Amino acid sequence: MYGSARSVGKVEPSSQSPGRSPRLPRSPRLGHRRTNSTGGSSGSSVGGGSGKTLSMENIQSLNAAYATSGPMYLSDHENVGSETPKSTMTLGRSGGRLPYGVRMTAMGSSPNIASSGVASDTIAFGEHHLPPVSMASTVPHSLRQARDNTIMDLQTQLKEVLRENDLLRKDVEVKESKLSSSMNSIKTFWSPELKKERALRKDEASKITIWKEQYRVVQEENQHMQMTIQALQDELRIQRDLNQLFQQDSSSRTGEPCVAELTEENFQRLHAEHERQAKELFLLRKTLEEMELRIETQKQTLNARDESIKKLLEMLQSKGLSAKATEEDHERTRRLAEAEMHVHHLESLLEQKEKENSMLREEMHRRFENAPDSAKTKALQTVIEMKDSKISSMERGLRDLEEEIQMLKSNGALSTEEREEEMKQMEVYRSHSKFMKNKVEQLKEELSSKEAQWEELKKKAAGLQAEIGQVKQELSRKDTELLALQTKLETLTNQFSDSKQHIEVLKESLTAKEQRAAILQTEVDALRLRLEEKETMLNKKTKQIQDMAEEKGTQAGEIHDLKDMLDVKERKVNVLQKKIENLQEQLRDKEKQMSSLKERVKSLQADTTNTDTALTTLEEALAEKERTIERLKEQRDRDEREKQEEIDNYKKDLKDLKEKVSLLQGDLSEKEASLLDLKEHASSLASSGLKKDSRLKTLEIALEQKKEECLKMESQLKKAHEAALEARASPEMSDRIQHLEREITRYKDESSKAQAEVDRLLEILKEVENEKNDKDKKIAELERQVKDQNKKVANLKHKEQVEKKKSAQMLEEARRREDNLNDSSQQLQDSLRKKDDRIEELEEALRESVQITAEREMVLAQEESARTNAEKQVEELLMAMEKVKQELESMKAKLSSTQQSLAEKETHLTNLRAERRKHLEEVLEMKQEALLAAISEKDANIALLELSSSKKKTQEEVAALKREKDRLVQQLKQQTQNRMKLMADNYEDDHFKSSHSNQTNHKPSPDQIIQPLLELDQNRSKLKLYIGHLTTLCHDRDPLILRGLTPPASYNLDDDQAAWENELQKMTRGQLQDELEKGERDNAELQEFANAILQQIADHCPDILEQVVNALEESS
């Protein structure tokens, strides 16, 4: 205080020796004990025996300085450069960090209220900084300007409120310093004015409480303003996200990276684009219908041509000629040509053989005319008979070939096996013809060699002439048959050429049909692609609808928050008005106090002349005090030396503890060695029994007990360390203790490792099941080791208890020494207090008179400044009120605009949902119509095939068509179920809308509940109508379809609509909620019943699904 030189910056401990110790209590009475001769604040301090006296002006200035700012010790500013957490505001000394270049001034001397004065320019926004505004590219200019304006207004309001806080804090601290400095003097020397001072003090205390409340209210307002700023930032962020969404949407459609603003033009553009897409979808649907009609007509023409092909090619028995069919046709024609060539070859062979036969017969006729009958003639006759038999076999082969040709023409193609058989027959015929030629040559040679004998055989050949005539007749008949066969072959070749031409014509027509079908298929694929694109567009629209709904919810929440903010700001305006009234009353009270203080200052100026004589006595008393302080310092040095000796003793104790820890580590190493022995024993073991398992369990229990004892030992060691830490204060001892703790943790790790190995060994021991005797011996050895370890643990416990007792004794001795030191220091302090009291009794009169005069002058100046400050505050509060009113009006305008935009978005949402439903219903209708057309086409094909003549293949085709028809019927059933689901989803969406509208309002009114009830009733009537259509269809077709299905109770109820609506108007909100739940249950039951009827229809008679679809259209 008097030695600290009133400086906060550089504080040197060397300049503290003549000054006051920081440990001494702060007293306002010792505010001007030691100072320099010039009244400065830093410089050379006056020594104990300087003998200089201070003038009255210096004393008054010193007292004024000490009264305004209070004493500042070195202990108060030892942590000037230390780091403190951000935004911690306490009602004590300021400990916050300030940026470079900002002065920090202490604003009061009270130990309870202090603050740091920060320049208003350094006050930042939120966490002492504003985020950089980097949304210029995404945020529109109007929104950016509005945001900047609001942020600037809020910053100015924050600065004004903080300035008010600083001024109020200064007033509070000044008042407290005045009260604390003037109360003691009034008690002793100014008894007539004691009552007045007490009244003033009470007034000041009440004003201080009022100011504190005002300060708290201003803090709350600051917090609320920060909350509003954050809300506005969130709103700006949401607006930016909306703009980015619209920008992305517009860039994906047009390819131009333009910035989309949320305006009515964007909504109109979106709506126009949506209408254009709907028109395109309608045109696409029309073209799809036209293409489907064209496809159906093409299918009918194709079916007609197929039927004609079937009629023309019944021999081929195939519906259509694909690429494989054309190849088969080529093979068939090739086989027919080969068969014709084979027939021509056989005919030529027959002609040659007939010529040879005729030649032979003529020769035989000539030679047998005169030849006698002998055995040779008989041989010749047998040869001729053999030739006749061969000719007949060849004729049979010809007939077989003709039959094969007819089979080829009827069946269309010869199989590979038949072809191989034909080749074999051809080879047989060729070999036979060669054999015959060889025989004829041999006969010629025999005839030439035996010409002499022919004459003898002529007589015998006369009898054979008749037979030869018969052979001739047979040969003529065979010639006629050959001519007939040739004519048949020519007709067959002509028919084959005609069929070839017809097949080529049919092929050309089929290729044309295939080309047209390919074109139609490409068109259908293109239409499907366009349908998929439209479905993706619909999905995008649904996503946009969901986003709009989310935006609607967020904007509704923002509207609610804005309403709350409006209410809060209105409350703030009321509070500010009350503040202004209170400040005006305070100004009046301050003016009255100023007048009374001026009168008292005039009366006190006469008492300032008697202060010079008391200064000399004060200086002598101060010199005596300095001597006593030096004695106390010497005693403190002695106490420190004694404490150092105690610390050395503790170090020795720590060494002993280290030795004990090393002993414990040796025990651990022994345990590890025993564990290694256990491992070796476990590897040598091979079997184990139940007795060994029980002994192992006992060993585990013993190990757990050891663990618990180790943990107890560690806890005891920790307690001993904590006791030693309490007794020690040097850094070396703390380092050694930390080293011991690390060793203890290492010991724990080693014990945990040992425990893990023990567990692994136990598992190995459980697997071993042989060699019981060896294991018993080793278990006994382990038990002995456990007993030894238990003994060691007990010894360690005993040693630890002895060490604990020693440490407790040492702590008690240290406490006794500290108590003795405290007693001696207390005695010295008592003697010092007595001397101080004596000195103070001499000083009181002079000091208090000087203080009172100086204080009165300062009070006058401060009251004037407080009055001007209060006037400024009143003006600033009025300006703030006007700004708050303007903000209220702007927020109201924003509310109205946001509500309008919300209404527009809701209408847009409902339109988009209705269009989506319509598109989905149209798509489902188109699919159902296409399926019905396909089913009818399959039915027509089945009827045509059943009317055809061939049986086997037509039955297979009918079965295939029926399978396709069943598949189409299943698809139709699936589509009807999808349509029913769509109706149910539409109903649920409507119900969700109504429930969501009810949820947005916190407590829905009865009128809001009646509307969804009426919608539920309409849906119920539609479901009843639909179920009625289905039941009539089932009764008309087959009543057994509805066997086992019972309609719900709600289906048979027929209520009067008008009476029911009148009853709804009379019901309360709870009754309406119950009625709503009942209606939902009834609709769910009716929906389930309708689904069950549809399932029965699909199972029993799927052919009436078309009538079901018509019933759906009527009900919808």
From Swiss-Prot:
UniProt site (Breakpoint for translocation to form ERC1-RET oncogene): K719, A720
Modified residues (N6-acetyllysine): K10
Pfam families listed in its UniProt record: Cast (PF10174), RBD-FIP (PF09457)
Organism from which the protein derives: Homo sapiens (Human)
Protein name per its UniProtKB record: ELKS/Rab6-interacting/CAST family member 1
Compositional bias (Gly residues): 40-51
Membrane topology annotation: Peripheral membrane protein
Residue numbers of Phosphothreonine PTMs: T38, T1046
Gene3D superfamilies: 1.10.287.1490, 1.20.5.2440, 1.20.5.340
A GO cellular component entry from the record: synapse
Coiled-coil region(s): 144-988, 1060-1100
UniProt-listed InterPro entries: ELKS/CAST (IPR019323), FIP-RBD_C_sf (IPR037245), Rab-bd_FIP-RBD (IPR019018)
Localization annotation: Cytoplasm, Cytoskeleton, Microtubule organizing center, Centrosome; Cytoplasm; Membrane; Golgi apparatus membrane
Function of the protein: Regulatory subunit of the IKK complex. Probably recruits IkappaBalpha/NFKBIA to the complex. May be involved in the organization of the cytomatrix at the nerve terminals active zone (CAZ) which regulates neurotransmitter release. May be involved in vesicle trafficking at the CAZ. May be involved in Rab-6 regulated endosomes to Golgi transport.
